[in-house]
Amino acid sequence: MEVYMDNSATTRTFPEVAELMTKIMCEDYGNPSSLHMKGVEAEKYLRYAKETLARILKVEERELLFTSGGTESDNMALIGCALANCRRGNHLITTQIEHPAILQTMRYLETQGYRVTYLPVDPCGRIRLEDLRRAMTPETILVSIMHTNNEIGALQPIEEAGALIKQMNPDTLFHVDAVQGFGKSRIYPKKMHIDLLSVSGHTVSYTHLRAHETLRHLV
């Protein structure tokens, strides 16, 4: 008998979901941007998905952007925000135990002239808010902290970190990689002071972007 214990990373697809997806791929396969009947039917599924996610997160539908996966969501959030806000500063903050999708993107941004501070963690894998406070500067344009660590499961004090960031500089953007945490923890971007939230349903993902924020297009 097989025992699978990695559901937080990738969960086995429910039979009813697989059945619906098979129907969509075989029958309702139109481009949701097209005006013909197949496109209209496909757009209904997309709209329903956005309505459902917006209701769960307590955000507006227009604040949700669908992507191909968690890595694209993280890349778009970090690079897009860095490029769009480079005139305000060039300092970014993250942690030493982020997913490679974050760490490698931060290293790329360093090659483009951005300064990055990597926060250490305590023995339980959690950041210290005092370290975050000391790392913040007037040049800090973005802070990225994961919700749940993909290796050790450590939960970060996201709401407290978000409140601290906004207290010190309301213009500093707060990005949270919640690929591992969404669906297991209650995550409300507005309540938790989150400007950008990356989530994956494996492998269709989305990024939440606060309504008045902008991203520089990557493509």
Predicted regions mapped to residue ranges:
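Extreme N-terminal starter segment of soluble prokaryotic enzymes
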Residues: 1-4
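Glycine-rich phosphate-binding segment of PLP-dependent enzymes
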Residues: 9-59
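Conserved beta-loop-alpha segment that forms the PLP phosphate-binding cup at the N-terminus of a helix
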Residues: 41-54, 59-89, 98-105
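PLP-dependent aminotransferase-like
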Residues: 79-139
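Conserved active-site segment immediately N-terminal to the catalytic lysine
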Residues: 173-176, 182, 188-208
